[in-house]
Structure formats: structure tokens, C-alpha cells
Amino acid sequence: MCETMDFFERYKNLKEKYEEKKTKPKVIVVGRSNVGKSTFVRLMTGRKDIRVGKKPGVTLKINEYDMGEYILVDMPGFGYMAGLPKKVQEKIKDEIVHYIEEHADEIAAAVQIIDTKSFFEIVERWKGRGEIPIDLEMFDFITDLKISPILVANKMDKIKKEEWDAVLDGICEYLKCQPPWHQWKFIVPAILKEGKGIEEIKKKILERVRLFKKLRGIE
């Protein structure tokens, strides 16, 4: 949650723990299926061979891309995936959690992408079943590990422009971050299919990567 996100202190601790380790930082990309992760990775890497589709569950394995200063890690989508048994979906989710836990000390930032249009409906549906909404669970998991988040509120074109602030403030409330959303520098509204928001995301990634490297003594 927002009140516990002391990432600067975490970076200082990592410098001592990894004084001799000179690996590139990782930046992970997480999100439910069909929120725009593959589109984001294509924009970041410039690769045309990354599959993008309307059906959930296009990415089913962990993929790593060397971005020069850091490694971009594209995680499979979690939650509903078309054509996959629930048991397989749970296995994929477990693999995501295991990877993040195992590599937490190497991760400079986590880019979590959400579908802004469906976010509220899905959260309320899960809460109505007495379950923790998966988007909120992932955000809590990331921040509990003291990994610096970048929350990409994608598909903002589905929201009326005059409602953007109210919608983003509402997301803050679900994340237990006091509105207004502008004060939280980790939130980026985006329309990834049009490339909107990508430059701001790149900027935030590099800020976190360079701070991470500086405090760990990595050239």
C-alpha cells in the first residue's frame, strides 16, 4: 500500500547486500490478461514479432528483453485466460509470484498495467464473491516487497476526458492512496494502442533504474 512504499530505504539496503553483484536491474511487466501488456512490450522493444491479440492469454511464458540499462521482463497475464483450465491459470499465477519473490532484490521497478474501463467492475465483482480483487492483490504484493510500482492506467480512451480525474482518484482510493491521483508519481494514464503515455512510462522506468543502480554501486 502507498503508506508503506519506502523504496529509497530498500535501495540503500540492496547496495550493502549486493556490493559485489553487478547484474543489470530488472523491470517487470505485470497485469491481468488482455490489459495491453503485449502492446506495451512491443512499444518498449520495437519488436514486431511479439503477438498482440484481443483474446486474453496471448503471453503464456516469461520473456526477458535486454534494454541496455536494464532487463525488461514480460510476465504472463494473470486471471482469466481463454481456453485454459483454471488449474493451469493458477499454475501460471504461482509461477509469476515465485519469479517475483525469487528476483525481488534485482527488480528496480514493476510496471503494472490495468484496464481502466473494466477496473471498477472487476474489483467489485471479486469483492462481491468475498475474494481479494486480483489487481489489488498484485499491487499489494509488489509494494509489500518494496518494489517501486509504475501503475499504467491503460485504455483511457474508453473514459470521457472530463471524467479522467475522478476515475483515477477512484483507483487511488481502491489502492488506499489518498487522492488526488496527481500527487502519486507512479500513476500514468495511457492509451497504449496509440502510443500515448509511453514516453512518460519510459522516463519513470529510467529514473528508477538509475537510482537503483546508483545506490547499488552499479556502473
Curated annotation (Swiss-Prot):
Mg(2+) binds at residues 38, 59. Residues 23-211 form the EngB-type G domain. The keyword Cell cycle applies. One of its GO terms (biological process) is cell division. Pfam families: MMR_HSR1 (PF01926). GO terms for molecular function: GTP binding; metal ion binding. This is Probable GTP-binding protein EngB. Its cofactor is Mg(2+). Belongs to the TRAFAC class TrmE-Era-EngA-EngB-Septin-like GTPase superfamily. EngB GTPase family. CDD domains: YihA_EngB (cd01876). Necessary for normal cell division and for the maintenance of normal septation. Keywords: Cell cycle, Cell division, GTP-binding, Magnesium, Metal-binding, Nucleotide-binding, Septation. GTP binds at residues 31-38, 57-61, 74-77, 154-157, 189-191. Signal peptide: none annotated. It comes from the Archaea.
